[in-house]
Amino acid sequence: MKELSIASSEFHTVEELQEYIKIGLHFPDYYGENLSALYDCLTQSADPIILEFDVDGFFDDTMKQYFKKVGKVCEDAVEENELLEFSVILPKEEGW
């Protein structure tokens, strides 16, 4: 089983986040570090995966929007792969 917890405030760039996901979930070297590649790896995984997003702040609006896109990809992947679990810990403030 692969487990990965992602705290939104720890990432300043898309590249940092994608690299963290790649390493944390042991994705192959050919992982494209983009949303399409993320979806492909999540839906094709034969290993159980648990992903948890802790939305605890953002470096900037670009990262906030990207986290929303990653969350949508994960939600879509859950529908295709029963071995995938995805949860989000939302902040108390509005706007997510």
Where are these regions (language model features)?
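Positively charged, polar, low-complexity stretches
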Residues: M1-W96
